[in-house]
Structure formats: structure tokens, C-alpha cells
Design a protein with these regions (language model features):
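Basic, polyanion-binding surface patches
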Residues: 1-188
Length: 188
């Protein structure tokens, strides 16, 4: 699982005059026509409540020069205790919510039309209602972030826990022509 490629994004939403945002690595395009995306948000994250109630969100695609300070504001603090948007470059989106433009490659807003409970997370499926490219800088990937910036927070899907890297456990199902893997106990 650790070799899957991810981006690093700020997903934001607002409800009843209050806004919140968070770092997310699971944002992906579903279709081009109509323009549809999905985001996976941990149910325990404050942003989840905002998206669930408002049925909308914005996404900021961060550039590969994004400082750890900005990632830290949206990734390691709760909006219950602090206004994450204070001192951060934003524009007001069509939904009336702040959209982060600081270190943004692009931004877009989306309206949720479906959601799927996937255990610890909800997958919000949405139609993109607007978007804008802001620069041609390359986007920040999770691999770059992990190599250069630090470790995933505990609620992130890519969190590895205190034990560090763990080998996947054997499921008994192997694809054809795959090398045999029996788990860490056999060393193979």
C-alpha cells in the first residue's frame, strides 16, 4: 500500500458561518464529463461534519514548494480550537467559504451528490462546479511530503503506527504469476 501515489490537498468546507479545512491525500477524479471527484475524509475529523452538513467542499492542490508550516496548520491542528484560515491567503468561493490559494497549483469547488460509508472514512462523491489553475508549478505528492516533511498523522489512511513499516499480511489470494508472499513470519 505504501507505493500507491497520492497528492497532498487542502479540503475545506463551511456551514452556518463557520469554516474549516484539513490536509487530505485522497482526492481523485471520477469523470471528466460531467466533472466529478471524490474525497475520503475521516469521520472523526472536524471537516467531515462541515461537508456532511453543507454537502459541499473546496479542494486546493498544493505545489511542491508548500512549507511545512502551512501543512501543519491544516494537518496537525483542529479547527475546533483555532481558525485555520487566519493569516492564510484565501479567496471567497461561490459557496461563500474561504478557498486556500496560498501555494496552490489549482483550486476547485464541488457539490456532494452521494456519499459512501467506507468504515473509518466517508467517501464524498461530488460534481465540480468551478475551478481555476493558478500556476504551472508541479503538485506536491505524498511521497515528496513523507520523504522531506514528516510522518502522517494518526487518522490519515497512510499512517504506519509506532512500529513503522509493516509488511502486508498474507490473504491467501494471489494474482496469477505473482511471487509468493507468506508474510513477515516466514521471511519470504
Amino acid at each position: 500500500m505504501w507505493s500507491l501515489s497520492y497528492g497532498i490537498f487542502i479540503v475545506s468546507s463551511c456551514f452556518e458561518g463557520k469554516a474549516n479545512g484539513q490536509i487530505a491525500n485522497t482526492v481523485f477524479q471520477i469523470s471528466a464529463e460531467p466533472a466529478r471527484v471524490a474525497v475520503a475524509i475521516n469521520k472523526e475529523n472536524y471537516t467531515h461534519q462541515f461537508i456532511e452538513k453543507s454537502r459541499m467542499f473546496s479542494v486546493t492542490v498544493l505545489d511542491d514548494e508548500t512549507p511545512m508550516k502551512l501543512i501543519g496548520v491544516f494537518g496537525f491542528r483542529t479547527g475546533k480550537d483555532v481558525d485555520k484560515f487566519e493569516g492564510v491567503e484565501t479567496i471567497e468561493g461561490d459557496f461563500g467559504c474561504p478557498v486556500v490559494t496560498e501555494h496552490a497549483v489549482s483550486v476547485f469547488e464541488a457539490k456532494v451528490f452521494d456519499s459512501v460509508d467506507v468504515g473509518t472514512h466517508t467517501l464524498f462523491v461530488a460534481d465540480v462546479v468551478n475551478g481555476k489553475m493558478l500556476t504551472d508549478k508541479p503538485p506536491l505528492t505524498y511521497a515528496q511530503y513523507h520523504a522531506n516533511k514528516g510522518k502522517a498523522p494518526e487518522k490519515a489512511p497512510t499512517y504506519r503506527g509506532a512500529a513503522g513499516e509493516k509488511a502486508p499480511t498474507y490473504t491467501g489470494v494471489e494474482p496469477p504469476n505473482a511471487p509468493t508472499y507468506r508474510g513477515p513470519e516466514t521471511g519470504k
